[in-house]
Amino acid sequence: MNQLTNLSSAEISAQHEQDAKDLTRILPASKKVYIEGSRPDIQVPMREISLTDTPTGLGGEHNPPIMVYDTSGVYTDPNVQIDLNKGLPSVRQKWIEERNDTDVLSGLTSKFGQERLKDIRTADIRFAHIQNPRRAKAGKNVTQMHYAKQGIITPEMEYIAIRENQRQREAVDMRQHPGQNFGAKNLKEITPEFVRQEVAEGRAIIPANINHPELEPMIIGRNFLVKINANIGNSALGSSIDEEVAKMTWATRWGADTIMDLSTGKNIHETREWIIRNSPVPIGTVPIYQALEKVDGVAENLTWEIFKDTLIEQAEQGVDYFTIHAGVLLRYVPLTANRLTGIVSRGGSIMAQWCLAHHEENFLYTHFDEICEIMKAYDVSFSLGDGLRPGCIQDANDEAQFSELKTLGELTHRAWEHDVQVMIEGPGHVPMHMIKENMDLQLEVCKEAPFYTLGPLTTDIAPGYDHITSAIGAAMIGWYGTAMLCYVTPKEHLGLPNKKDVKDGIITYKIAAHAADLAKGHPGAQVRDNALSKARFEFRWDDQFNLSLDPDTARSMHDETLPKEAHKSAHFCSMCGPKFCSMKITQNVRDYANNLTNSDSEVEEGLKAMKEVYQEQGQKLYHKV
């Protein structure tokens, strides 16, 4: 494993060498900058995109750089030496220690974790620098929600406020349409106190396990920028640890705000350790997947004890949020009988099968308060799973789906009583005209806890293009108030996504999230659009490429027809050519208008002269030629 993940090792194949370069390559005209907070160790990363000046012929003005949100971590910082074998540098360790409410344990307390650590068969693939985990001191609660309710502004909250603002005060063109926010708050400036209030009220979460100090704090809530999640993970059919780590770093490079490791294949424990130690963003999991592996895939053999040990195992590794399918109740399972596609959630189907086999209530529901006790000891956030989500548009918004959603609302209140952070997972497959009903009901029954949706996919006829069918729904539900969108790749329903699929899914969902921010009228959301539009009008081609979500693709598409360097300053593109470019024509019209110096009296004299000509020609509109 060490040879596979060492970026400089001669053992790495040529493709892996290229992958390593791709992960650390700085995007064109960009540089990593850090904004300092109220203390020297609050250093908030952003990406600064430099722009060229407007040509003299078009006014000759300076265009200041544009600041954008950056999820890539230190991988794009040339001053940091990347060594995957050692993991990322800690961002939050000092903050956690200063609070003096955690203990460093003498070792892992999870039975399974202890077994894996002693298993000589995993020695070669095990992360070499495993630290003893932290846990809350007896009687202490270490969640960001608990601190927020106590009126405490943590360094994480200040970090997030700086990050969300993206230095908007320095932006030149803040023109923006007002948008329709459906009750969300559009503050011109996010303050640390506002972050605290939103977390205290449960309207936002800061997923940040005390055992993931490498994490760069971020927030999920409808009054903040819309976030996106990327799913990765191995399966029984393939993928290695280094491939999954590469997928994670690749996804964060292009804009994934969180990552879910949905591994169901070999070495789940070790794969997750490598991912967490090298991830600058929160990591989520579905613990029931690994619990099922521990009973050889037989759902009926699952027990609360096995699941509890899995929660502790993953919490001690540093998982930041758990998807828990506690809303799949025994009485709801029959409601899916007449569905076209039944239960499509893996976690939902596992728990439904267990309930039917034992004819007992879902043990995730009956042990929910015990789960909360574990969550608050490590500050793991809930992502309450939608195990009965619709798997096709025909099943959208049915009784099974909405019954579960109402139960998730009940569980949200129970989690909040423990000061545990909660977000709610949503569908699924929903046609456009039925999407808003989902958002409205979620806001009502879950009291504005953040909504986290998979799409939704708006049609079922496009396998291979479901990143598009879902992005349509994602943009809409993001506009209505969803806080985080789970990406869908072109491989959805077809296979395990590769590196290209991951990037395609990320870019597609960055578009959907940004479109939602624009539609909501989120302050500053239009700054980048304005800058790119200005560059386009002024034929600053390089600036257009560099301001785009995917500069590499934009440049390569332009170069397919206009490859020469001289074409980067041409006042046309291959779509219209030099004579029919609307923007060039508009510039000519502007130049003509600016050169008109006629006074009002001159205009009147001209009109009088033309009137006389008209009368001399017999006052006829048309004349024979």
From Swiss-Prot:
Q: Which GO terms describe its biological process?
A: thiamine biosynthetic process; thiamine diphosphate biosynthetic process
Positions contributing to substrate binding: N231, M260, Y289, H325, S345, R346, G347, D386, G387, L388, R389, E425, Y452
Q: Where does Zn(2+) bind?
A: H429, H493
Q: Which GO terms describe its molecular function?
A: 4 iron, 4 sulfur cluster binding; carbon-carbon lyase activity; zinc ion binding
Q: Kind of enzyme, top EC level?
A: lyase
Q: Which Pfam families match?
A: ThiC-associated (PF13667), ThiC_Rad_SAM (PF01964)
Cofactor requirements of the protein: [4Fe-4S] cluster
Its Enzyme Commission number(s) read: 4.1.99.17
Record key words, sorted:
4Fe-4S, Iron, Iron-sulfur, Lyase, Metal-binding, S-adenosyl-L-methionine, Thiamine biosynthesis, Zinc
Q: How is the cofactor bound?
A: Binds 1 [4Fe-4S] cluster per subunit. The cluster is coordinated with 3 cysteines and an exchangeable S-adenosyl-L-methionine.
One GO cellular component term noted in the UniProt record for this chain: cytosol
Q: Which residues bind [4Fe-4S] cluster?
A: C573, C576, C581
Catalytic activity, per the record? Answer: 5-amino-1-(5-phospho-beta-D-ribosyl)imidazole + S-adenosyl-L-methionine = 4-amino-2-methyl-5-(phosphooxymethyl)pyrimidine + CO + 5'-deoxyadenosine + formate + L-methionine + 3 H(+)
Its UniProt pathway annotation is: Cofactor biosynthesis; thiamine diphosphate biosynthesis
Q: What family does this belong to?
A: Belongs to the ThiC family.
Q: What does this protein do?
A: Catalyzes the synthesis of the hydroxymethylpyrimidine phosphate (HMP-P) moiety of thiamine from aminoimidazole ribotide (AIR) in a radical S-adenosyl-L-methionine (SAM)-dependent reaction.
| Quaternary structure note | Homodimer.
The name this protein goes by in its record: Phosphomethylpyrimidine synthase
The scientific name of the source species is Acinetobacter baumannii (strain ATCC 17978 / DSM 105126 / CIP 53.77 / LMG 1025 / NCDC KC755 / 5377)
Organism phylogeny? Bacteria, Pseudomonadati, Pseudomonadota, Gammaproteobacteria, Moraxellales
The gene behind this protein is: thiC
